[in-house]
């Protein structure tokens, strides 16, 4: 008999699954639902003469990062968000990257900035993330966004944890009083 943890729902209560049961979550179906809603939101913005635009910065030639960036741009364009890609060579200096970020921060036609991580080892990643204007920081990594999130304020939340919560809510319904564990190695 598995041990019981005080305070946690026990298997079989409130329709919970038995100890060894699992639920397969269809992430592709959930993503499709999100894309439909985002497309509606973008269409609504366009009716107000607002064209959402995302600037994506990729420094270096990391193959995994190139795939991530390509997929992000494709999804953005699929829902009507204009994408502007900035590919920088691996030997770009932190100062050059900061200049580009400052230019994008000042560009009123750009609504969001995504800096693809990791950066090459010689670059100051934290300084680059802090240079992105908090209201354009689509990954939610700026310290103002991280701090606001930890205080329960509405901010730009990081995509990965937001996606995890969305999947859990779609699968389990109301999460109040429930416990979930997400295992990962990043600061997201």
Question: Which residue ranges define each predicted feature?
Answer:
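Glycine-rich phosphate/diphosphate-binding loop of Rossmann-like nucleotide-binding domains
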Residues: 59-74, 158-188
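Short beta-strand elements in bilobed, periplasmic/extracellular small-molecule ligand-binding domains
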Residues: 54, 76-90
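Anion-binding alpha/beta catalytic cores of soluble intermediary-metabolism enzymes, centered on
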Residues: 21, 112-180
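Low-complexity, intrinsically disordered or signal/transmembrane-proximal segments
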Residues: 10-13
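Short, well-structured alpha-helical segments in soluble
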Residues: 96-108
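Positively charged, low-complexity intrinsically disordered leader regions
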Residues: 19-48
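Short beta-strand segments enriched in small/hydrophobic residues
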Residues: 51-60
């Amino acid at each position: 008999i598995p041990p019981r943890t005080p305070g946690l729902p026990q298997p079989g209560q409130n329709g919970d699954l038995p100890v060894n049961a699992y639920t397969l979550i269809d992430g592709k179906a959930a993503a499709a639902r999100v894309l439909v809603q985002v497309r509606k939101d973008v269409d609504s913005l366009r009716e107000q003469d607002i064209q959402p635009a995302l600037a994506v910065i990729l420094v270096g030639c990391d193959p995994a990062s190139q795939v991530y960036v390509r997929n992000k741009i494709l999804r953005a364009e699929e829902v009507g968000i204009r994408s502007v890609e900035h590919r920088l060579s691996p030997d770009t200096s932190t100062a050059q990257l900061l200049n580009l970020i400052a230019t994008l921060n000042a560009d009123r036609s750009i609504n969001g900035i995504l800096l693809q991580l990791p950066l090459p080892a010689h670059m100051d990643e934290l300084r680059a993330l802090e240079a992105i204007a908090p209201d354009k920081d689509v990954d939610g990594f700026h310290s103002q966004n991280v701090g606001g999130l930890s205080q329960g304020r509405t901010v730009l939340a990081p995509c990965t944890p937001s996606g995890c919560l969305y999947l859990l809510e779609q699968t389990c319904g109301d999460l109040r009083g429930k416990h979930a564990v997400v295992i990962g190695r990043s600061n997201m």
